[in-house]
C-alpha cells in the first residue's frame, strides 16, 4: 500500500501541474533558505515554487498529461508552477541566476511542449504580453493615422479641383 503522505503529495503536485500554464524545473542545490525565499518573492504571486521528490514529479506530471524530459529529474529538483505570464517568471529566474551561481534552470514545459534550459532562458528575453500589446497598438495607431491621411488626400484633391472649376466658370 502506498504511503498516505506520498499519495497526498502526488495529488497536490498533479493539481499544480494541471492548473499551471507553464512549469520550470530547477536545481536548488547550494541555495540557502533565505535565497530560496528571495527567489519565491521575485517570482511573484502567480508562481508557486516547490521542492519535490523526482519520483513524485515524474508520476504527477504523467498523471496530469504533462510532458517532462525525464533526464531533467536528477539531483535536487524544485518546480516553478506558473499561472499566467511565463515571460515575467522566466525574467525573474534569469536575473536570480545571474546573482546566484548555484541556481540552475534545468528545463520546463509550456503549452504542452517540453522546453530545454536554453528555451526557458530565451523566453526571458521576450517582451511580456502587455508590452507586446502596447507595441502593437502603437504600430496600428501610426498605420491608421497614415491611412486616414491617404483617404483624406483624394477628397481634398477633388475639393480643390471643384473649387478651381468653379473659379474658371465664374
From Swiss-Prot:
Organism: Corynebacterium urealyticum (strain ATCC 43042 / DSM 7109)
Self-association state and partner proteins as the record states: Part of the ribosomal stalk of the 50S ribosomal subunit. The N-terminus interacts with L11 and the large rRNA to form the base of the stalk. The C-terminus forms an elongated spine to which L12 dimers bind in a sequential fashion forming a multimeric L10(L12)X complex.
Keyword Metal-binding: no
Pfam families reported in the protein's UniProt record: Ribosomal_L10 (PF00466)
One term of GO molecular function: large ribosomal subunit rRNA binding
Protein name: Large ribosomal subunit protein uL10
Chaperone among keywords: no
Gene Ontology CC, one term: ribonucleoprotein complex
Similarity annotation: Belongs to the universal ribosomal protein uL10 family.
GO biological process: translation
Function: Forms part of the ribosomal stalk, playing a central role in the interaction of the ribosome with GTP-bound translation factors.
InterPro entries for this protein: Ribosomal_uL10 (IPR001790), Ribosomal_uL10-like_sf (IPR043141), Ribosomal_uL10_bac (IPR022973), Ribosomal_uL10_bac_type (IPR047865)
Alphabetical keyword list: Ribonucleoprotein, Ribosomal protein, RNA-binding, rRNA-binding
